[in-house]
Each structure stands twice: as structure tokens, then as C-alpha cells.
């Protein structure tokens, strides 16, 4: 079908927000998700694997900001991708099937090990660059 000649069109959210006024306020005191029966963030930070990976990643935040280098920022942003954490989900029953779709890993533990290895290598490079940045600051 074609939208030509119809009243339908495709707009991005910034265009919609300029064209229309809100009709009400949605109160959502907790995160809402499309994923799993709980519809919360447990698909990404709901087990020890995910929490350990998340915590290790965010311990690098201040160094990444201090380095202020586009290559490091790019990798930092990539490592924050939700898919990495989603692949580490250990949920069972109907939710477990969803987590196996499009997942390149055989298990959440394999996803965790791979992610932590990549993160450890990145941390080594961050520490080197951070050390260079600290030494370059005039006393």
C-alpha cells in the first residue's frame, strides 16, 4: 500500500512533539520495559552476572570522562549496549525462550565470560591512557 494521497504520514518523535500537545501526564515511578513477564529492568540487571558486569563497566566512568578521547568514548558507549546485558539473563520458563532468540551465545555464562574478557582488555587500555593523561597534566 502507499501513503501517497492519504492522511497518514511518518514522523519522528521530535516532529510529533512540536506538532501536538500532550493530553496528560503518565506517572511511572519505576522503569517500564517490553521484556519478560515482569516488564521491568530484570532482563538487563536482574542477576549477579549482569550486576557484576554493569558495576565493573561503570567503575571506569570517571576515567573515561577524564581521558575525553573519542575512541575510548565510542567503545565505552558500545559496551553500555543493552544487548550485552540481556544475553546474560538467566531467566527460565517462557522468558528463557525469548532470551535465546538472536543470542549469539550458548548460555548466559558464556556471554558473561566474553563480555568480562572484552571489558578487562578495555580496562587495561583505559588505565594506560589515563596514566598518560595524568602524567601530561602540568604540576
Residue positions per predicted region:
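Single conserved hydrophobic/aromatic residue that forms the stacking wall/gate
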Residues: 1-5, 9-10
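Hard-cation-handling environments
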Residues: 14
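Active-site cores of enzymes that catalyze phosphoryl transfer or operate on phosphate-rich substrates
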Residues: 17-69
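Histidine-centered catalytic/metal-binding microenvironments
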Residues: 56-139
